[in-house]
Amino acid sequence: MKDSAGIKRENKTQIWKLLLSGQAYTKQQIALQTGLSVASCNTYLNEMELRGEVIGQKQKLHDVGRNAVVYSLNEEFESTLCVFFQWIQGVKSITTAVLSPTGNIRYEKTKSFSLLDAGVIQGEIAAVLEQFANVSQIVVGTPSIAEKGVIRHSDLPELENVPLKPLLEERFQRPVILANDMHYKVYGYCRQEQLSHQVVTLVNYPSGVLPGTATVHKGVLLTGRNLFAGMVGFLDYGMSLEQQLEKLHRPTAEPLIVQATIALISILNPHRLVFTGDLLEEGDLARIRRACQKCIPEEYLPEFVFLPDTRDYYLMGMYWMAMDRKENRE
């Protein structure tokens, strides 16, 4: 049974979740949307406004009539710092972005490095925090497995076995979320496209590195026991990893892509397969689908979708995971 403090936190969270949309609401509208009484909303909103979390502004709701106070989240109250690094077509880069409480991008920068180790990551984060002291969470995306805060099987060898999560939390004294880049991308895709009732798998084939996939099953991200779920680069293709990497170029990659796609459909039975990565073009999907039909009946094949760029979904996936954590923490 929840105590009064727990009920209060839960009710405030309901209001906060409603205001995440970025829209402004009156107390009466908030009460209607949340099921709370107007008196309770008044109390909670006053407390949240005093803390600086929300802003109340007078606004005329109709052409005639009295002004009403509408409430929205304060975009300056706190920020989320998103950090991701990658190795694409031989270029190592790190991107830092600061997102407001409603997911608006307030700052974004990408820099390339010949060596991208933990020191570089810390330096880039420190530079951003000098500008945005109100960052309350740091969300990090890695092209690797991120088991227990440690980077493993990384595309960037200088980050192999680095305990990045505890390292960053110790230095910057803020909570850190560290996860595989594909997890953020597919989660952001499902949240932004409002696919909470579907099974969606994102399939990524970049050049020069092993492929990866990630799946959201009706709103729940499937990560597996060791956060290893979706690592199709480790399927048995009848060759070593080195030989597989040699084949991961156009057009020799396509048979490997077909094999992985058949495995994904058979095991996950998704509504939608979303293909991305520079080894794929939109015209490839019809051939891949025809190849899958040789093994899987047409009625069990999912929708095939080509996504040329995942960057926006990546950032929004990081944002939504940060918001989920905030909701569960408060």
Describe the predicted segments one by one.
Residues 1-57, 62-66, 70-106, 117-134, ...:
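ATP-binding/phosphotransfer module of carbohydrate and carboxylate kinases, centering on a glycine-rich
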Residues 174-265:
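Glycine/GP-enriched mid-protein hinge/lid loop-to-helix segment characteristic of carbohydrate kinases
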Residues 80-84, 137-139, 199-204, 212:
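Short glycine-aspartate micro-motif
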Residues 59, 110, 226-227:
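Short clusters of small/polar residues that mark proteolytic maturation junctions
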Residues 105, 151, 221-222:
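Hydrophobic "anchor" residues
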Residues 143-145, 208, 279-280:
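Short glycine-rich anion-binding loops that position phosphate/pyrophosphate groups of nucleotides
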Residues 108-192, 286-295:
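Glycine-rich phosphate-binding loop and adjoining helix at the ATP-binding site
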